[in-house]
Amino acid sequence: MNNFFQGYNLLFQHSLFASYMDWFHAFNCSLLLGVLVFVTLLFGYLIFSTFYFKSKKIEYQFGELLCSIFPTIILLMQMVPSLSLLYYYGLMNLDSNLTVKVTGHQWYWSYEYSDIPGLEFDSYMKSLDQLNLGEPRLLEVDNRCVIPCDTNIRFCITSADVIHAWALNSLSVKLDAMSGILSTFSYSFPMVGVFYGQCSEICGANHSFMPIALEVTLLDNFKSWCFGTME
C-alpha cells in the first residue's frame, strides 16, 4: 500500500532523511485509508442494526470497546516511526565534518565554507544567453554550492536583508533565512548529483529569480574543486 502512495509524489527523494519522511507520509496515508474504511463499515453496521433491531434493547459494549482500542492502536502505529525519525534527525545534528554558511540577499545567495579559509562566493541565476545545453531555465546558477557526498554537512542559514527561505524540495530541506538569526541544520547526502531549489519566501520583485543549485560530488572531486576555486 505504501508503494501506491509513493507513486503520487511530486518529486523523488534523494537523501536518507527525505526517503524516511517519504515513507512515513505514505505509511500515514495508508493508515488514514484504513481508518476511513473501518469507520464507513462501522457506521453502515450501526445504521443497519438500528433498523433491524429497533424493537429490541441492545447495548453496544463491544462497539464501545472497539472504538476505544482502535484509535489507541492507530496512534501507537504513528508514534513509533515518528519518534524514530526524530531520533535519527537528532543524531544528524550531533556532529558535522563541514560547515557551510548560506546568506540570502536580494536576489542572490552567498556561500562561505567556514572550515576552508578564503572559500566564499556569490551565486546568481544564469540569464538565458549564459545557459549551456541541458541546463534548466530559471534554476541554473553561475556558481553552484558544491559539497561531498556521504559527509555530514552543517548548514548555517541567515539573511543580509529581508526574510528568505533556502529550500530544496527533492531533499526535504527548507529553512528560513532571517536577518540577525543564524538557523542551523545538519544533513548527509548519499547520492551524487545536482539538486535545484528556489527561495520559498516572497522577498521582493525578483523573488522568482533566486534559484539554488547544490552539487553533491565525490570527496576527491570536492577537494579538487576547492583548490580550483581558491586559485
UniProtKB/Swiss-Prot annotation:
GO terms for molecular function: copper ion binding; cytochrome-c oxidase activity. Binds a dinuclear copper A center per subunit. Its cofactor is Cu cation. The chain crosses the membrane at residues 31-51, 65-85. Residues 1-30, 86-231 are mitochondrial intermembrane. Its EC number is 7.1.1.9. Its main location: mitochondrion. It is found in: Mitochondrion inner membrane. Keywords: Copper, Electron transport, Magnesium, Membrane, Metal-binding, Mitochondrion, Mitochondrion inner membrane, Respiratory chain, Translocase, Transmembrane, Transmembrane helix, Transport. SUPFAM superfamilies: Cupredoxins (SSF49503), Cytochrome c oxidase subunit II-like, transmembrane region (SSF81464). The keyword Transmembrane helix applies. It comes from the Eukaryota. The keyword Repressor does not apply. Cu cation A2 binds at C199, E201, C203, H207. Residues 52-64 are mitochondrial matrix. It is a multi-pass membrane protein. Cu cation A1 binds at H164, C199, C203, M210. Component of the cytochrome c oxidase (complex IV, CIV), a multisubunit enzyme composed of a catalytic core of 3 subunits and several supernumerary subunits. The complex exists as a monomer or a dimer and forms supercomplexes (SCs) in the inner mitochondrial membrane with ubiquinol-cytochrome c oxidoreductase (cytochrome b-c1 complex, complex III, CIII). Component of the cytochrome c oxidase, the last enzyme in the mitochondrial electron transport chain which drives oxidative phosphorylation. The respiratory chain contains 3 multisubunit complexes succinate dehydrogenase (complex II, CII), ubiquinol-cytochrome c oxidoreductase (cytochrome b-c1 complex, complex III, CIII) and cytochrome c oxidase (complex IV, CIV), that cooperate to transfer electrons derived from NADH and succinate to molecular oxygen, creating an electrochemical gradient over the inner membrane that drives transmembrane transport and the ATP synthase. Belongs to the cytochrome c oxidase subunit 2 family. This is Cytochrome c oxidase subunit 2. It comes from Caenorhabditis briggsae. The gene is cox-2.
